[in-house]
């Protein structure tokens, strides 16, 4: 019989320490306090979890290895539509996204011809743009605010339908 699956809190305590653990706990508490759900999407995404609102994926995070984690926001067409998305995002948040937008090596079969704020990218990671490892300070706050932007966009799209 398989053992009990570890909770996110148990995994974080096992893998992270010091400021990295404190920052992750802060981020995880932020998600819980903002009505977001966190689920393990598949066995393929080792160490990764999906952040969702109203059943729509709006971000994710990974506890990747010993004392290393990262988070990101979901980028897909209905969240980046300029008329919808940009009315919620500040110029600084937009720049933060652009500065942290990552493409993937061609071997990962990322998405080609992906338009993001007027620029076309090739080999875009089909997961989500992730921010530097072990986010803290301004980077962590930007990640939180962008997740809230995605939550608001999802709510507005649902309200319009």
How would you describe each model-predicted region?
Residues 1-17:
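A short, surface-exposed helix-loop junction/capping segment
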Residues 1, 33, 159-161:
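Polar low-complexity intrinsically disordered regions
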Residues 42-161:
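Short, conserved beta-strand/beta-arch hydrophobic-aromatic motifs that form part
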Residues 13-38:
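Short N-terminal edge-element motif at the start of the domain
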């Amino acid at each position: 019989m398989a053992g009990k699956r570890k909770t996110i809190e148990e995994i974080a305590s096992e893998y992270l320490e010091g400021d990295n653990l404190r920052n992750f706990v802060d981020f995880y508490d932020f998600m819980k306090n903002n009505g977001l759900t966190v689920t393990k999407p598949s066995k393929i995404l080792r160490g990764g979890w999906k952040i969702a609102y109203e059943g729509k994926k709006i971000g994710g995070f990974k506890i990747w290895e010993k004392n290393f984690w990262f988070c990101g926001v979901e980028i897909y067409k209905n969240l980046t539509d300029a008329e919808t998305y940009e009315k919620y995002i500040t110029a600084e948040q937009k720049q933060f996204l652009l500065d942290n937008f990552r493409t993937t090596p061609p071997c990962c079969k990322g998405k080609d011809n992906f338009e993001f704020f007027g620029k076309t990218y090739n080999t875009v990671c089909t997961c989500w743009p992730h921010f530097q490892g072990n986010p803290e300070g301004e980077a962590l706050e930007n990640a939180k605010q962008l997740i809230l932007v995605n939550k608001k966009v999802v709510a507005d799209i649902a309200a319009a339908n």
